[in-house]
């Protein structure tokens, strides 16, 4: 999981 993972709106990992 990326460090900027909140729920699915961050990076590009849906």
Swiss-Prot record:
GO terms for biological process: proteolysis. GO terms for molecular function: cysteine-type peptidase activity. The keyword Transferase does not apply. Keywords: Disulfide bond, Hydrolase, Protease, Thiol protease. Its EC number is 3.4.22.-. Belongs to the peptidase C1 family. This is Karatasin. It comes from Bromelia plumieri.
